[in-house]
Amino acid sequence: RGGAPVGYLSELNQLEQNAILFLRYWSQCAKADHDLQNKFWSNITYDLGITKTRQAIDAFDEIFTLCVKYSRRPIMKHDLECKCIGGDESCFANIIGFAQDGELEDALLLASNLVAPKFASYLVASARKFAASITISECNPLEAEESYYQSYSLH
């Protein structure tokens, strides 16, 4: 049931798309081909810079560990390159989105559908950390030392 298509990645905002892509990547990294892995990490690092990418990875690792250890049932995910999203992925993305927006009760309610209720608050706290690290602030652009991929103009 949690794998039934409920929408498309293109219908989500960037944070929600990234949350689903991270979930898929973490779930499939052992079987994803090397070129696909390099492209995934290159794109994320290019967008965020090295420091924020590391923070996002650490926060997401907490989320994924909670989901693996304490999930109420197996969380269904689509293939890494699939354009549609499943019900569980949608729920997951909404937890991240609600956590970012400070709507913690809504995030907690959805989190308790994915993990055992006593661990839902930990999932929401980790979701807030992930959202903060993966969001690029318009008033706080990447600093030069943060991004290995930053370009420089000579003239």
Where are these regions (language model features)?
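Polar/charged low-complexity regulatory segments
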Residues: 1-155
